[in-house]
Design a protein with these regions (language model features):
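Core catalytic lobe of class I
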Residues: 1-130
Length: 130
């Protein structure tokens, strides 16, 4: 069964049973200052890292053994999220997928990178091939 959940991730994740999810696809704010009307994309560094640790810890809790997670992330924080997932939470890195854009994007008078990273990690239990 596929169930899509829409809401604040920290609230919604806490309501999900531990070890009950096979796959998570997450596209959190990239913390690049984009105006979504709620200030969620313009935090100072420490607050953004704490926020990331919080929701990734919940993802780690709800994933089944052998479950996988794909995290879309901007270039500024990919190494930090990798560190949280691999070193802090013990997830196993499978691959780094690059989502390449074919058009130039400009926002706030800045040229945005032509690609974004997707971290593909897994919990123990399956032989994942990247």
């Amino acid at each position: 069964m596929i169930e899509l959940i829409h809401g604040d991730c920290l609230h919604e994740l806490k309501a999900i049973d531990s070890n009950s999810v096979d796959l998570i696809v997450a596209d959190p704010p990239y913390n690049v200052g984009k105006d979504y009307g709620n200030g969620s994309d313009k935090q100072d560094f420490d607050d953004y890292i704490a926020f990331s640790k919080s929701w990734l810890s919940e993802c780690n809790r709800i994933l089944k053994r052998g479950g996988t997670i794909y995290v879309f992330v901007g270039f500024r924080f990919i190494s930090y999220l990798y560190q949280i997932m691999e070193m802090d939470l013990g997830m196993h890195f499978v691959n780094w997928i690059s989502w390449h854009y074919t058009q130039v994007c400009v926002e706030n008078d800045s040229i945005l990178p032509p690609s974004y990273g997707i971290l593909y990690d897994a919990l123990d239990g399956l032989d994942h091939k990247g």
